[in-house]
Amino acid sequence: MRKKFFFFALCLAQSLLFPLHVSSIRPSQFCYPPADLKELKILSWNIYMLPHLDFKNSNKLRAAAIAKELNRSDYSIIVFQEAFDKNARNIIREVLHENFPFFYGPVNNSSWYSTQTSSGLWIASRIPLNEIHSIRFDIASGFDRFANKGAILLEGEWHKQAFQLVATHIQSDDYGWEIREQQIREIHNKLLLPFSREGIPQIICGDFNTDHAETEHYNKMLTVMGAEDGNLTGMEKYSFSSDDNEITKGLNEKPRLIDYILLRNSHAIESISRKIAVIKNNWGLNHRSLSDHNAIEATIAFSM
C-alpha cells in the first residue's frame, strides 16, 4: 500500500482539482428513475487515480476505459475513491454526464497552492442529491496527511423514499488500527448520529482499509458506526487482490476484502444484495485491470 502513494507525494504541488460541482441538467433528466425500476443500485470503487503526473499507471487510458464500462452500466449512483487526478475526472465526466448528470466533489478540495490535495471522494449520480455535511478527519498518518481524507453525507429520494449516502476513504492500512478507529468514530459522531432521522436509511460506502478477515477490527468498525454488513453474492470475495491484476502484480499481498457498503437505520429497506464487481476493459497492450481494487456494488429494494 505504501508504494501507491510514492508518486502521489511528488505530484501534490502541481495537482489542480475541481471544487464541488454539479453538472447542468436537462428537464428530461428529472424523469429518472422510471416507475418500473424499483431497485437502487450503488457502486463504490477505489479507481487508483493518483495526481496527473503519475505516468506509471496511465491514468488517461484507464479513465477512458473506466468511463466506457460505467456508461453502459445500470448503476444509479457511483461513489469513487482516489479520484485525485483532474484529467482523469474530466475524461470520466465527459463520457458519463449524459447518463449521470449530477456530480459531487471532489470532497474537501484544496486551493491550487496547497501542499495537500482533496479527499479523492467523487460521486456521479443519475438522481439529484443534497449535500448535507462533509468532514475532514482530525488525524492521519503517512502520505494520507497530504490528502484531505474525510467523509461526506448526501441525501436523496428513490420513488419518494428518502435515504442518506455516506462516502468515505479511511486511513491506509500501513498504519495502526487506532487511526482508522478514530476516523470511523468521527464518521459516526459527526455525520451518522447528528443527521440521523427516523425512517431514513443510511448507506455507508467506501474503502475502509479494514480487512474482513481481521475479525476484531472488522467487528469494531461495525459496532462503532452501529452498522450492518451482509454476505457477498457471486464468486469473487475480495476487493483487493494481486491475483489476475496487472497493477498489483508482484506485490505478493494476500487477497483482502476492505471495501464495503454498509447499512444503518435499515428498517425501510426490504432487501439488499452485495457483490464484488470485477470491471475490466482493454486500455493498453496486455492491460485489462482498471484499478488496484475491485469495486463493490449493492442492489437495494426499499419497502414500498
Residue ranges and their predicted role:
Residues 55, 98, 115, 177-178, ...:
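Short, well-ordered secondary-structure micro-motifs
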Residues 38-41, 117-120, 148-152, 161, ...:
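Residues that flank catalytic or metal-binding motifs in active/ligand-binding sites
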Residues 18-32, 192-202, 210-304:
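Metal-dependent phosphoester-hydrolase catalytic domains
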Residues 40-47, 66-92, 124, 154, ...:
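Active-site beta-strand/loop signature of hydrolases that rely on acidic residues for catalysis
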Residues 57-58, 64, 176-192:
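Alpha-helical scaffold elements lining the catalytic groove of polysaccharide deacetylases
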Residues 2-95, 110-118, 299-304:
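N-terminal, active-site-proximal structural segment of metallo-dependent hydrolase catalytic domains
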Residues 25-34, 59, 77, 81-170, ...:
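Structured beta-strand-rich core segments of catalytic domains in phosphoester-bond hydrolases
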Residues 47-50, 85-86, 110, 127-130, ...:
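Short, solvent-exposed loop/turn segments at secondary-structure junctions
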